[in-house]
Amino acid sequence: MTAFYVGPPWQPGVYSDFAITAAYVSPQQHAAQVKKAATRYLGVMKKAATAAGVPCSCAYTSGEYPYLEIVKAAHRNRCDLILMASHGRRGISRLLLGSETSKVLAHSTVPVLVCR
């Protein structure tokens, strides 16, 4: 099993004549924040897999399009199956926010199992 985490990409702060509209985070600080979040999330996954007797490797990246990173990682690791959760968004929130799970389903040639 490979547990995988995709964090948000680094983006520079936005400046205007009046104020800084977003707190500046350097690329190095951003990478450290993504690593911290990934370590926390993947640690939970690895602990559960280990408790069930399932070997588990962990990997993470950041990217603008998480679904593409997931599909690429599945191919890179020669995965037989992608397991994803569904948050069950409905209506306007799904239209506005989209669904990474739906996008993986649409773009992956590797089978996808969706759990609620």
Report each predicted region and the residues it spans.
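Conserved beta-strand termini and adjacent loop/short-helix elements that scaffold enzyme active sites
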Residues: 4-6, 59-63, 115
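Small/aliphatic-rich secondary-structure junction motif
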Residues: 1-24, 48-57
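Short, flexible loop segments at boundaries between secondary-structure elements
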Residues: 110-116
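Short, well-ordered secondary-structure micro-motifs
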Residues: 13-16, 68-71, 94-96
